[in-house]
Amino acid sequence: MRRLLIVGLVALSCGLIARATEEAAEAVPSFDEGVVPEAILQAAIEARDLPLGERMERISRPMLGMPYLVDAVGEGKLPDVDPPARYDVYDCLTFVEEVLALALPADPRSAPMIRNQLRYTGGEMDYTARRHFMLEQWIPENIESGWLKDITAEFGETHLIEKQVTPRTWSAWKHRRKFQLADHELPTGHYALPVLSLDAAIEAADQIPPGALILTVRRSRDHIPIIVTHVGFVVPSDDVPRMRHATKMGRRVVRDERLAWYFDHVRWYDWWQVAVSYTHLRAH
């Protein structure tokens, strides 16, 4: 039987949210004012006193059915002139970032500050500071900065997926040219993620709290720097555990899946073995 792995569960630190929210009250970028659609803004306002997982579900509910489009956001300036936020299309990461940015602060007008803290090193909106790569940047830097906490071990025996990334790894990668970064700006080093086996993940599925992020991870290959390929989150459900994500599968939209179905679907990918990760976010 093929083996699917589930990577580190993460929780959000409360103190950093509060600090970023206070800063955002004084420094909301003007280019984001008025961008959030009324239905999403109203959902964020009405849900702000709910537990975090429920807030994420309510806020993202109006996004269901929105088209999937990869790399639709940028800094509004060269080298990526796309706007910092869009609500008509999403890829998997921008969907998660936007939901978190709206769910975490008490006032959704603070969303740009929260988004920038999650997306950029130091919170500075600059292409070279963007956390382009999940394994090498987005996950470890958000853990180091205090936003995230790995809680994988709470749900079973963990294993490590390890990856050595060198300049040669980047030069051999066929998608290297898509990133407007100098060679020295690409992350290198040894990276590792704690994981659960698929069997352990399925067994623990009912224990995973709403708001937990799900990271899909492929088996490491020497010539490919990317192993984390997808992200979504667990939503509250009255019946079976479900995830919500912006996906290329099927109709290429934001949609919900039964976790059991999703695990069964990805376990049989023949062209690359896949892995999944849950991450939990602590409400403040």
Where are these regions (language model features)?
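Acidic/His-rich structured neighborhood in mature extracellular/periplasmic domains
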Residues: 71-191, 209, 245
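Cationic-aromatic interfacial patches
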Residues: 24-94
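Conserved small/polar residues in nucleotide/adenosyl-binding loops
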Residues: 279-284
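Boundary at the C-terminal end of the N-terminal hydrophobic targeting segment
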Residues: 18-24
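Bacterial N-terminal signal peptides
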Residues: 7-15
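C-terminal soluble interaction/assembly domains
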Residues: 217-276
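Catalytic-site beta-strand/loop segments enriched in glycine and acidic/polar residues
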Residues: 60, 64, 68-79, 186-228
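Positively charged n-region of N-terminal signal peptides that target proteins for export
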Residues: 1-3
